[in-house]
């Protein structure tokens, strides 16, 4: 990891984890305006980035802890990722793994923080509670957790928000 970079600082502070969860959107400016008008803190206003493969618009908001969400609009872009990124040819790629979709991304929280984070997704994104479990549902002698799965309207995006529950060891 390159020292002094945003992701390098995040990993130094938190260990392995995710700094930013990006969402593909039809209109990044509208997504940013809507979420910030509902109380999200802006990290970066919508900005145009471009190269010879086209253009994209990105905007970022703060969520829980040091985690952010970036809205990515790639309507006029023909590259594999975003303008300015170059394809890397891997010698030993995982060809044929068959992965086509991410089912969910988990946001683990400290004890007592799960509900305020879920309230944030409901208020800022208009999401709803898809499913929830408590320590009676997910526990062993040594560990337990509570979880609320938040989802968007069509339930294509799901984000379980977890927090630890009492056990002989902490697991989350």
Regions found by a protein language model. Name each.
Residues 1-45, 52-131, 139-172:
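Glyoxalase I/VOC metalloenzyme domain signal
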């Amino acid at each position: 990891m390159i020292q002094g970079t945003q992701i390098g600082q995040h990993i130094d502070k938190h260990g392995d984890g995710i700094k930013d969860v990006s969402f593909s959107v039809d209109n990044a400016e509208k997504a940013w305006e809507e979420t910030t008008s509902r109380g999200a803190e802006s990290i970066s206003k919508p900005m145009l980035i471009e190269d010879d493969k086209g253009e994209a618009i990105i905007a970022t908001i703060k969520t829980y802890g040091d985690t952010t969400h970036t809205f990515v609009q790639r309507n006029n872009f023909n590259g594999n990722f975003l303008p300015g990124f170059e394809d890397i040819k891997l010698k030993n790629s995982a060809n044929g793994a068959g992965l086509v979709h991410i089912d969910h991304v988990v946001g683990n929280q400290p004890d007592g923080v799960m509900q305020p984070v879920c309230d944030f997704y409901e208020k800022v994104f208009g999401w709803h509670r898809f499913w929830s479990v408590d320590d009676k549902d997910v526990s062993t002698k040594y560990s337990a957790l509570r979880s609320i799965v938040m989802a968007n309207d069509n339930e294509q995006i799901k984000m379980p928000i977890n927090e630890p529950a009492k056990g002989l060891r902490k697991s989350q």
